[in-house]
Amino acid sequence: MGGEVVTAPVPEFSSPALIPYPSKVVRGKGGVRFKSVHVHLDRDVPRRDDLVREMKDVFGMFGIPASVSKDVFEEGSLTWELSLDAGIEGEAYILSVAPEKATVRAGSFGGFFNALQTLRQLVSKGKGGFFMPSVQISDEPAFALRGMMLDVGRYYMSPAFIKELMRRVSRYKINTLHLHLTDDPAWRLEVKKFPALTDRVFHWKSRLPGKFYTQEQLKELVDYCAGLNIQVIPEIDMPGHSQAFRKALNVKMSDEKATKALVALIKEMCSLVPKEKMPIIHIGTDEAHGKDE
């Protein structure tokens, strides 16, 4: 069933709250009432499979029947068209809902992903089906890095929990996960060269000793987050907050042995994921007072 043009406000549908609020929003009169959607992606849209999956998730959360085609339009549905615009930089996008069709233009995967999260907030559901207001949105992030830090060094969180949390915060355009993997209570990442680091014997008994992430789990998390436009920044904290490291390897942070071990394990971590997927590794550097804790 096709979209129905609505030229006046519809009482049963609430006005959408957009979080974070876009850079520029021009609201028209009325909007479009519809019962299904069809999505068309231009051939040059980047990471099409990821965007198709995200589109299905957006409409699926409302129970909206959606068909997706990479090449052809279908009759009888409100059409969403995604097209690449090289003139739109970074994670910016332009989203338009008009009577004839709805469109998204962006110059990158991040721009398209952000637009879909705004689209997610534009949809209303009522007795008459689904509704989107007539609107023109031009948006770009105020901050290039919009992050969340999880202190799993002190408080272990399961991979499933982290993935679900990232799924939720991605809807608000968070694009960075800072993963604090090590601290005094525990070392949470598998290091094949130094297996003692994840041994429960060297972890605090009160902080889920022996719980850690395998290298495969880190790879899976990086890939999963990439599909949500989130970059993972793993952190190995040093020289402060290094009790678990010092106990497991029986070293002081000022020892040459400790330095060599840190270099080796950082190299091992860097080899796990291609640089383009995980370009940054955080090494803490807090409390560098020249003293051993």
Role assignments for model-derived ranges:
Residues 1-144:
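Acidic, contiguous N-terminal accessory segments
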Residues 11, 88-293:
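Feature activates predominantly on carbohydrate-active enzymes
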